[in-house]
Amino acid sequence: MIRKGSFLLALCLLFSTAAAQTGSFKGPLALQLYSMREELRKDVPGTLAKVKAMGFRNVEMGGYYGLTPQQFRAELDRAGLKAVSMHADFNLLDKDIDRVIGEAKIFEVKYVGCAWIPHGKDFTPADVTRSAEVFNRAAVKLQAAGFRFMYHIHGYEFIKDGDGTLFDRLVAATSQAPVWFENDIFWTTHGGADPAKLLEKYPQRFRLLHLKDMKKGTVGNLTGQAPDVTSVALGTGQVDVRGVLIAARKIGIEWYIIEEESPEPLINVPAGKKYLEKIKY
């Protein structure tokens, strides 16, 4: 006969083991404000209030929508939102890093990133060499000012390059400077790579994650471009979001950032946030 105490102990062990095998999303979570670009163009204060009402406290900057950096910072403060990262134009990083640093100071972000490397029809090894020079130089100056530099993947970097890809070449070319990476799981998938495996391959280089799903049936390419309608609510598309979250937790991703490129962010952003609140992994 099994004693009551032994049975209860076994039951507790069973549940504790199950709990150890699964977990809920803990974040920290932010919203890339580019998701709300059309709304922000019409009404910055009202849109930021909606973002706060969705339950967000943190955001990633994606432009100023007709305001100065100082004015936009004031609107964030009024809405009760904090910018944790921002994107800067490649040419500004190359030609006017002091301006970028000045704007980063206004928003008091930790990360300053670049989301697009100018290039011709195809991304080339020469583009990697040039961008690595710009990124390395910018990263050193940003670090001296108290910030971290990161590059946001956009899909075109996965063109084959020997036994690897041009992304591998970019990682290697920026290994001596403090250059970090932001894995956009939509664009990584669209470019033919596996976002979870990429995190596992470079666990020391990824610090931010763009959570974005891709419409089922979408065929990717290496252009870094896709129709906005191929961006769908998180958890409803073809990206293995759960697998990405498992890999991200293992390597210690600092920020999980929802981004929507769809024409329905007021529907898809809350739906994606709700998905994260319910998922177990």
Regions found by a protein language model. Give the residues of each.
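Active-site acidic/histidine proton-transfer and metal-coordination neighborhood
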Residues: 57-58, 65, 90-181, 266
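Hydrophobic faces of well-ordered beta-strands that scaffold small-molecule active sites
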Residues: 27-32, 59-61, 83-88, 112-114, ...
